[in-house]
């Protein structure tokens, strides 16, 4: 998908935008220009979410700081969004970007996510940008054999590392989870082992849940 569409450069004001903020020229010119371009629709619509709990009280309920940024359903709209927000490596420690199929919230409590789990890749600080982009392209481009099992992806910036994760619907479907994990590693050319954690196991464990699957 990415090879068929030319990326657009970020706007000149990108460095001055706050995290999660989308550039807007205010005169409607971007929307007008988009209307003159033949759009390439995606199989699914996707919503970008941003979570920046920095400065919030630790008593605030988990998930209460997550808010949607933009929903896109074409290749052009994706690049228009991606080129006008910060890369993960530029986010504050503790912040997360989420990209989930439209109408699925990036929360364990969402009924579509409730019985699922996640594959996770960890990397050093400042190293997640490429992993995140390639994950998004594979996901919204429907490159996974079990793409219907995928809810979305998350990139998390933490003090000592950054993490990219793919959330799936049905943790009990071992064949689907193994396929997704293996294909994801291939798309990213990632050589180390990765583990799949079931959401229910994560909620019950205080010391860190064990991997249900490993590839």
UniProtKB/Swiss-Prot annotation:
One of its GO terms (cellular component) is cytoplasm. Residues 16-27 have a biased composition (Acidic residues). It comes from the Eukaryota. According to the redox status, the Cys-113-Cys-151 disulfide bridge may have a role in regulating protein function by affecting its ability to bind capped mRNA. It is found in: Nucleus; Cytoplasm. It holds the Pfam family IF4E. InterPro entries: TIF_eIF4e-like, TIF_eIF_4E, TIF_eIF_4E_CS. Residues 40-43, 50-86, 134-143 are annotated as: EIF4G-binding. One of its GO terms (biological process) is translational initiation. Its main location: nucleus. The keyword NAD does not apply. Keywords: Cytoplasm, Disulfide bond, Initiation factor, Nucleus, Protein biosynthesis, RNA-binding, Translation regulation. Residues 1-32 are annotated as: Disordered. One of its GO terms (molecular function) is translation initiation factor activity. Belongs to the eukaryotic initiation factor 4E family. EIF4F is a multi-subunit complex, the composition of which varies with external and internal environmental conditions. It is composed of at least EIF4A, EIF4E and EIF4G. EIF4E is also known to interact with other partners. In higher plants two isoforms of EIF4F have been identified, named isoform EIF4F and isoform EIF(iso)4F. Isoform EIF4F has subunits p220 and p26, whereas isoform EIF(iso)4F has subunits p82 and p28. This is Eukaryotic translation initiation factor 4E-1. It comes from Triticum aestivum (Wheat). The lineage of its organism: Eukaryota, Viridiplantae, Streptophyta, Embryophyta, Tracheophyta. The gene is eIF4E.
């Amino acid at each position: 998908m990415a090879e068929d569409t030319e990326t657009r450069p970020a706007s000149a004001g990108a460095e001055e935008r706050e995290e999660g903020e989308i550039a807007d020229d205010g005169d409607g010119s971007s929307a007008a220009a988009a209307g003159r371009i033949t759009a390439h629709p995606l199989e699914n619509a996707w919503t970008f979410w941003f979570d920046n709990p920095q400065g919030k009280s630790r008593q605030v309920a988990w998930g209460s700081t997550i808010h949607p940024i933009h929903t896109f359903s074409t290749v052009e709209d994706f690049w228009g969004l991606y080129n006008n927000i910060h890369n993960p490596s530029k986010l504050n420690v503790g912040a997360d970007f989420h990209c989930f199929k439209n109408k699925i919230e990036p929360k364990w409590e969402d009924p579509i996510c409730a019985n699922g789990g996640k594959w996770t890749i960890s990397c050093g600080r400042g190293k997640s940008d490429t992993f995140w982009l390639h994950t998004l392209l594979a996901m919204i481009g429907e490159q996974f054999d079990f793409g219907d099992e995928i809810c979305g992806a998350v990139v998390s910036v933490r003090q000592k590392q950054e993490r990219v994760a793919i959330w799936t619907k049905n943790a009990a479907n071992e064949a689907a989870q193994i396929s997704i994990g293996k294909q994801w590693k291939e798309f990213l050319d990632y050589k180390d082992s990765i583990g799949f954690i079931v959401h229910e196991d994560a909620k019950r464990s205080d010391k860190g849940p064990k991997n249900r699957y490993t590839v």
